[in-house]
Swiss-Prot record:
Part of a complex containing tRNA(Arg) and METTL2. Interacts with tRNA(Arg)(CCU) and tRNA(Arg)(UCU). Interacts with METTL2. This is DALR anticodon-binding domain-containing protein 3. SUPFAM superfamilies: Anticodon-binding domain of a subclass of class I aminoacyl-tRNA synthetases (SSF47323). The lineage of its organism: Eukaryota, Metazoa, Chordata, Craniata, Vertebrata. PANTHER family: DALR ANTICODON-BINDING DOMAIN-CONTAINING PROTEIN 3 (PTHR16043:SF1), DALRD3 PROTEIN (PTHR16043). One of its GO terms (molecular function) is tRNA binding. It comes from the Eukaryota. InterPro entries: DALR_anticod-bd, DALRD3, tRNAsynth_Ia_anticodon-bd. Pfam families: DALR_1. SMART domains: DALR_1. One of its GO terms (biological process) is arginyl-tRNA aminoacylation. Involved in tRNA methylation. Facilitates the recognition and targeting of tRNA(Arg)(CCU) and tRNA(Arg)(UCU) substrates for N(3)-methylcytidine modification by METTL2.
Amino acid sequence: MATGRLGVGETLEALNAAVGPGSPVWFKETHARHLRVRDFLAPRSALQARFRDGQVPECVFRAVSCLQGPGVAPVLRCAPTPAGLSLQLQRPAVFEHVLGALASYATPAKPASPGPRVVLHCPALRCNSGTLRLSQLRAVLVADHLVRVLRAHGVRVCSVPPVRDPHMSTFLQKLRVEWPTASKSTSTETLRTCVLANLNGSKEATLPPGVLGRLCLKELVEQRGTAGYDPSIDHCLVTEDVLSVLSELQEAVRHWPEGGHPGPAGRPDAGVDDCVVIHVVSCEEAFQQQKLDLLWQKLDDRAPHKQKHLVCGPVKMAGVPGTQLTAPQYYRLRHAQVCEASALKHGGDLAQDPAWTETFDILSVATIKFEMLSTAPQSQLLLAHSTISTKGTKSGTFVMYNCARLATLFEGYKHGTEQGLYPTFPLVSSLDFSLLHDEGEWLLLFNSVLPFLDLLSQTVSLAGTPGLHIPVRTEMVCKFLVQLSMDFSSYYNRVHILGEPRPHLFGQMFARLQLLRAVREVFHTGLAMLGLPPLSHI
């Protein structure tokens, strides 16, 4: 019997506990072909390893069949099959449970107490926007995505550095990247004093112009030998720019903005023990950032001990010999391709139509973000130049298109209601979800709506992971939205949702609309994690 919000993780945990001690044997099915006959499977090979001759004891069958507990989905049947132990859920009951509480499946719950504090540092934002490399753009988009996901889960995030270049600020607005701005630099006097004290009068006469001194970091690297710092790090040349970077980080940690957002300063020296610093850097910046991390620890005994690095892999564009495109050039290329593709589809020059300007801007950003974020951030990314990524089922445009189809569907229902074709939407508690028996409907609920928040929480883990690098899976949301779009598109093309205005058909129509309400909410939450607003038309 299910209690509370249903969860795939909770159900799997209960299933494995029912089998007894040992490694997990159950997994959730995802393929449509398998979901026609089962929802979970314990493979025969795993059962043979667990039980003598693969014979499952009768007590295990009974325990699985009577499975219940917080978050555990209700079981219909459990039976041995050639593939293994097959389990099917009470699908109408699962539909009713999930679709009767949409918000708890589409919106992350805020914790009762304040979450941890995170300083999220993206060095690429100190660059000039006109020279921003594609690998740096990738780091910026990954950082923005992380900020949104962390805040959605109640984590207090302070984004560093505040952007001072107005051209960079304008470019970020085009990309729908939310980042704080500032007009003044922080003071570096205290850090400069620390540097001079560490030099102990041993200032070198041969230092390059603008360098205050050379500080040895070798001892720190050796002390943290297993942490993951590059063993070749020896020393760091300290400049005013380096001190400015450290001063910004120091300010973010000690003078925490209220609510984790830029704004009035919170209480000074808010404590560093509960603070995690995440440096999101391009692969070209990784070595220098390790030096700055160590230098901060050397100069400031109150620097956070928990500093993690996320190194984004290189980005290359195929078909562009010689010099790589800058980030603004890449944006203009994708924007032009979006406008061209839309002109071919709709005819005429819609790019000059003010009503379409914002739509094209959003589609361009969606194209870029899905290209940049659909690959694991640590991996190399190869972008196509001439082959436009706005086409096909794996593009951001495809996701935005299907989100717009949902908007059109509900607008159609609204107009039908106003014209008297359909009755107003009944209470959800009165809907008959046993009328949802199409395999596409279960696919949408079981693969998308039900596991969505669990997937979102797996994007980044702030748990005490050893080592310098933080496990981050920023590709998960993009891949999820693409798969959801494919499943929804297949269902929508095959099933007529708004049927004939006949009373005996309304029950199934309303059950389907409630399911698609859930799909719409999941779409909107997922897109919000990418900084993308849903479109009502394309």
